[in-house]
Amino acid sequence: MDIKNFKLYRDKCYINGEWIKANSNETISVNNPASLEEIGTVPKCGKDEATLAIESAQKAFPEWKAKSAKERSIILRKWFDLINQNHEELAQIMTIEQGKP
C-alpha cells in the first residue's frame, strides 16, 4: 500500500508554518521494511533547512513563551483533538511504515 494516497501524507517538510521542499529538491525514499516497496518520499533536508527551522523556532519562541499556561493548553488540546480525529489514518500510515500487515 502506498501512503501517498492518504490525505495526511505530505512529501514536504513543515518549517515556519509552511510545507516546503528541500532546497536541493532531493528526496529520500520511505520503504516498507517487510517488502522494501517504496511507500513515499521525504525531503532530503540539509543545512539550509536546519538553519531556517532553528531561526524560525527562535523567532516564534518569545510569542509562545508569553502565552499563559491556559492559552498554551488550548493550542495543545487542538493538536490532541486533531490527532484523535485522524487516529485511524495515522495508525494506518505508521503500520505501513513499520512493515506490518
Indicate residue ranges for each PLM-predicted region.
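Glycine-rich loop-to-alpha-helix module at the N-terminal edge of alpha/beta enzyme cores
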Residues: E37-P101
